Structure formats: C-alpha cells, structure tokens
Amino acid sequence: MIKMELKEAKYLGGIGAVLNLVSYAVGGILAIAGYVLILLALNKISKIFNDDEVFKKYLYGVVLWIIAVLIVIFAVGISFVSLSFIPLDYGLTAMSSFLVGVILFYILSVIGGYFIKKSYEKVSYYTGVDSFRICGLLYFIGTLLLIVIVGIIVIIVAQILEIVAYFSLPDDLKSEN
C-alpha cells in the first residue's frame, strides 16, 4: 500500500483559489499570486499521480487567459488613443480594433477554459473529489457565456467551488499499487 500526501497541494490550491476570488475586490496582483499557488498545487498533484497533463493543461489555460486579458487591454487602449487623435471619420478603425480585441479575448478565454476543465477532470479522477470536475465544467461554461456577461457570474461560482474542491482534498490517499 502506497501513501500519497496531498496536504501541501490542498492548502496551496485552496489559498490560491481564495486569492483569485478576493482579487475582484482587491486587485489583479492577488490573482497572479493565486494562480501561482494553484499551479504549484497542481504540479504537486501531477507528480504524485505521475501525470504531467494535470499541470500542463491548467498552465496552458492560465497562459491563454493572461494573453486574452492583455489583448483586450491593448485593444481598448488603441481604440481610445485612436479616437483621441484621429479625426472622427476614422473612428471605424478604432471600433474595429476594439472588436478584434474582444473577439480574440473571447476565443482565447474559451480555449483557456477548456484546458482548465480538462485539468480539473483529471484531478477529480485521481483524487475522487468530484467538485473539481464540476468546477472545471463551470469554468468552461462561464467562458462560453462571457459573450452575454452572465459568464462572469458562472466563473465566480466556479471559483467558489474551486475553493471547496481544494479544501475537500484528503490530506493523503492510499493506493494499492
């Protein structure tokens, strides 16, 4: 019988998930710290279960989300600068750059949500904590629904469930291997 310790991953992931949720009120730096802690937790889980995909898929998802946010910030900035310095008849260019940015944001967010869903499905499979599977599904559905704004609420629910999922992890698992 092999004993696999999950206690460290449980607390790293749980605290990281709390930081992500609190970042809406406090600021983006907490979100970065939260994602780093979750990535550390998933790296530990990947090593425990000898499956790099758990870590890699979540990492891909987060990187895509970061790129999506940077693109939309850049597009909004370009649009405002264009509208400020370019005659009004060129406003269409500013609007089109904004729309391209929003479309790219949406596409990258959905793909990122899909990767996070896949990562959490694996965590659920290995640990037996079904909250991870549901959390991943809600992240994906939330990113799909971002286009109608309701997705933000679904993502917040996913983040709350993510906290529950991490703190529901057992301190250790026993395997027959």
UniProtKB/Swiss-Prot annotation:
The keyword Cell membrane applies. It is found in: Cell membrane. InterPro entries: DUF996 (IPR010397). It is a multi-pass membrane protein. It holds the Pfam family DUF996. GO terms for cellular component: plasma membrane. It comes from the Archaea. The chain crosses the membrane at residues 20-42, 62-84, 94-116, 136-158. Keywords: Cell membrane, Membrane, Transmembrane, Transmembrane helix. The keyword Cytoplasm does not apply. This is Uncharacterized protein MJ1644. It comes from Methanocaldococcus jannaschii (strain ATCC 43067 / DSM 2661 / JAL-1 / JCM 10045 / NBRC 100440) (Methanococcus jannaschii). The lineage of its organism: Archaea, Methanobacteriati, Methanobacteriota, Methanomada group, Methanococci.
